[in-house]
UniProtKB/Swiss-Prot annotation:
Matches recorded under SUPFAM superfamilies: GAF domain-like, Homeodomain-like, P-loop containing nucleoside triphosphate hydrolases
The protein's name in its UniProt record: Anaerobic nitric oxide reductase transcription regulator NorR
One Pfam match: GAF
UniProt KW Plastid keyword: no
Ranges annotated as DNA-binding: 482-501
Species, as recorded: Klebsiella pneumoniae (strain 342)
Taxon lineage: Bacteria, Pseudomonadati, Pseudomonadota, Gammaproteobacteria, Enterobacterales
GO biological process: phosphorelay signal transduction system
Keyword terms: ATP-binding, DNA-binding, Nucleotide-binding, Phosphoprotein, Transcription, Transcription regulation
Function comment: Required for the expression of anaerobic nitric oxide (NO) reductase, acts as a transcriptional activator for at least the norVW operon. Activation also requires sigma-54.
């Protein structure tokens, strides 16, 4: 055998190390790369017809954020279907998923590739991939030796998956790995703040507590809400979404609680509200800080007593609904200033979740960039979307005031720009494809010079200043047409008028022309 006793011992020790799964697998992959002499190695978890990287060595860091759907990666599909060691010949016409993703070899194609499917019983749970730039890199290792490696790694991976499920569900016994489960919403990130958030999601999801999710715009609060619902006993029942910021005051109560025929002009039939739709499930109220005080009082009653009244109906209806609420405001400050009910705040914030801003998430920007690159590749029918090292550095230097949403849009825009100037079905993203400054977020123009410096104001004042400037610019761009401005800002026009009035941008109701 090509493996020495000492080398096998190193592998066994790495698999049994008393450290976290992520660190254990990273060390294992590094050891395997050294023993096998390959240029790149990766451990992948299999779920929902795709491979998810758990640990890599010798590959670009953004690979950890990519999700390799079988339908778009024929080599990985071949590994998943093989049931045994797969050796791809150097002249294979199947594209390697890591072409262009090995630092220092971006312009070269991977030559030698070995795939080891990992099984728990008869169920595929992952794969180990080994890549080399030389065509004969793995010829000295027999299939028997590689099967031994696969068996050791598969056992460790299966144990890690079972332990993770135990920790998430906090129940015994667990269901077998191959049982059908509702698809969990994946939250990408390995930074300390995100690992803590994932742990808190697992804790609160198993309960039936109402949850308040706070965070800046674009951080992924809706994704967190989906993860809480999908990890809860209500996962098989509906998750109903309502954006409170997009609710005109005139229909907000009907949207929440429903109405009966004839309750108001235009009510031509009975209609269920969001609470009825979410019965036995979960209701996600996004931007809950935008609700009026009157509606807050009615929402509080539902949380207290579990009954609702349709508009125009004297009868009460019982509902069993878990409420998840999200806000980008500091609701404690809103309570102090009289814009949010203290009793409702306390009802919602028994177990609050805070979603960190992207600038606080260390290297997660690279993982997320890889994820969005792979999404773009699939959507645009490209063979590869590669993030050049200089581009990765540029992304890490930006402070991302728009958070994950801004990063997603930046990647999509960069792919479109790069594709327009590069031939073929492979796109390489370079720094020039990202159109923003490097050192800091773009500063406001001279017209906004009077905006208060963030260091000298609290969060509320800074947010108001930003909103005031954004609305002012949108109004100018739309010739002060309020309806067009509302569309540009993706707001309901009535909500835009209320917000503008609160910010001191208007003092009277809109005239006839402003609606138009």
């Amino acid at each position: 055998m090509s493996f020495s006793v000492d080398e096998l011992a190193r592998i066994a020790i790495d698999l049994q190390s008393d450290i976290g799964h992520t660190d254990r697998f990273s060390r294992l992959i590094t050891t395997l790369r050294q023993i096998l002499g390959c240029d790149a190695s990766a451990l992948l978890r299999y779920e929902a017809h795709q491979f998810v990287p758990l640990a890599i060595d010798g590959l670009a860091q953004d690979v950890l954020g990519r999700r390799f759907a079988l339908e778009g990666h024929p080599r990985l599909e071949a590994i998943a279907r093989a049931g045994d060691v797969v050796r791809f010949p150097a002249d294979s016409d199947l594209p390697d998923p890591y072409d262009g993703l090995i630092p220092g070899h971006e312009s070269l194609k991977v030559h030698a590739c070995v795939g080891l499917p990992l099984f728990a019983g008869q169920t595929l749970i992952g794969a180990l991939t080994l890549d080399g730039m030389d065509a004969d890199r793995f010829d000295s290792f027999s299939d028997e030796e590689l099967r031994l490696i696969a068996a050791l790694v598969a056992g460790a991976l299966n144990n890690a998956l079972l332990i993770a499920r135990l920790e998430a569900q906090n129940v015994l016994p667990v269901q077998p790995v191959n049982d059908a489960q509702p698809e969990r919403q994946e939250i990408i990130g390995l930074s300390a703040p995100m690992l803590q958030l994932k742990k808190e999601i697992d804790i609160v999801a198993a309960s039936d507590l109402n949850v308040l999710i706070s965070g800046e715009t674009g951080t992924g609060k809706e994704l967190v809400a989906k993860a809480v619902h999908q990890g809860s006993p209500r996962a098989a029942n509906p998750l109903v979404y309502l954006n409170c910021a997009a609710l005109p005051e005139s229909v907000a109560e009907s949207e929440l609680f429903g109405h009966v025929k004839g309750a108001f002009t235009g009510a031509i039939s009975n209609r269920s509200g969001k609470f009825e739709m979410a019965d036995n499930g979960t209701l996600f109220l996004d931007e809950i800080g935008e609700l009026s005080l009157a509606l807050q009082a009615k929402l509080l009653r539902v949380l207290q007593y579990g009954d609702i009244q349709r508009v125009g109906d004297d009868r009460s209806l019982r509902v069993d609904v878990r409420v998840l609420a999200a806000t980008n405001r500091d609701l404690r400050q809103e309570v102090v200033e009289g814009r949010f009910r203290a009793d409702l705040y306390h009802r919602l914030s028994v177990f609050p979740l805070s979603v960190p801003a992207l600038r606080e998430r260390e290297n997660d920007v690279v993982l997320l960039a890889g994820y969005f690159c792979e999404q773009c590749r699939l959507r645009m029918g490209l063979a590869r979307v590669i993030l050049a090292e200089a581009a990765r550095n540029r992304l890490q230097q930006w402070s991302w005031p728009g958070n994950v949403r801004e990063l997603e849009h930046a990647i999509h825009r960069a792919v479109v720009l790069a594709r327009a100037t590069q031939a073929g079905d492979e796109v390489v993203l370079e720094p020039q494809h990202f159109q923003f400054a490097v050192a800091a977020p773009m500063l406001p123009t001279e017209t906004a010079a009077a905006a208060p410096a963030i260091e000298k104001v609290n969060l509320r004042e800074a947010t108001d200043s930003f909103q005031r400037e954004a609305i002012s610019r949108a109004l100018e761009a739309n010739q002060r047409n309020w309806a067009a401005t509302a569309r540009a800002l993706e707001l309901d026009v009535a909500n835009l008028h209320r917000l503008a009035k609160r910010l001191g941008l208007k003092g009277s109701p809109p005239g006839k022309n402003s609606a138009g």
